[in-house]
Amino acid sequence: SGFQLSSYDMTTIGWGCAPEVQFKMNEEYSFMSGEFVWTGFDYLGEPTPYYSDWPSHSSLFGIIDLAGIPKDRYYLYRSHWNKDVETLHILPHWNWEGREGEVTPVFVYTNYPTAELFINGKSQGKRTKDLSVTVHNSGDSLSTANFKRQKRYRLMWMDTKYEPGTVKVIAYDKDGNAVAEKEMKTAGKPYRIELTADRDKIMADGKDLSFVTVKIVDKDGNLCPTAANEITFKVKGKGYYRAGANGDPTSLESFQAPHMKVFSGMMTAIVSSTEEPGKITLEATSKGLKKATLVIESGK
């Protein structure tokens, strides 16, 4: 709805396939040397499948969105591509006012084989990746309808019902040992702005950039995933506001203007240095929210 695609990531384009199809082919076919994904990073243009639906104007199938923020599918790829980094990611978010008691599936992307899901302390059971799935036994229409290939790489609880509170997952290794856990909570009302720079020290060359992740969080620091507040930015000192993006493929807001609405509670603000070294102060404000200030150092 709203010219967006679901975070469950079950939609594929006509000239492509689901990530799991390629994963499994690479594993089974020794003549395949690698994998090509279009695209890693969303870009302006080709708003598949909303080609003619205004105001859609950027791609939706990237692993990372237009603001440089990883999508849920990023963690699916990482769980398979990079076994050296622990991945334990829960989706979707858990703010679904009006869906109380309705079936709301929960997916977990992880590099571990098994996980157990809890909603408000009640176990929803364990799921284990189905290693029996092959390219040849999972391509028929019934297997596709039952998401058979997905069960090889995703842990899916398809019958969970939404209730506000805490979603928790415990991951287990191949020997059955609990090795990791993660929680996600229903966020309260938007309370403050949170700023996090990818680098707090940049070069004073008039070109270097600091990419700042902007979040709207509640009093307890939980991301507010449905927030759409407009943030206004001011930069003081030896730098200036370069651009911003929120990852919304339907947003027509200017990238250069020092104000923008967050999308799903987040956006990215970009601060540039000047050729004069010193402190750069980024201030973010929004009506009804506690403001945030971030200091970045620039030097030669």
Map each language-model feature to its residues.
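Short, solvent-exposed loop/linker segments at the N-terminal edge
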Residues: 96-101, 201-210
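Short flexible loop/turn segments that cap and initiate beta-strands
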Residues: 111, 117-129, 181-183, 209, ...
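Beta-strand-rich structural segments
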Residues: 106-110, 170-171, 196, 207-225, ...
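Edge beta-strands of extracellular beta-sandwich domains
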Residues: 176-188, 290-299
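Short, hydrophobic beta-strand segments
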Residues: 150, 155-162, 254-275
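Extracellular Ig-like/FN3 beta-sandwich strand-entry sites
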Residues: 162-166, 209, 277-279
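Extended substrate-binding grooves/exosites of carbohydrate-active enzymes
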Residues: 1-178
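Low-complexity "stalk/linker" and mucin-like segments enriched in Ser/Thr/Pro/Ala/Gly
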Residues: 135-147, 238-264
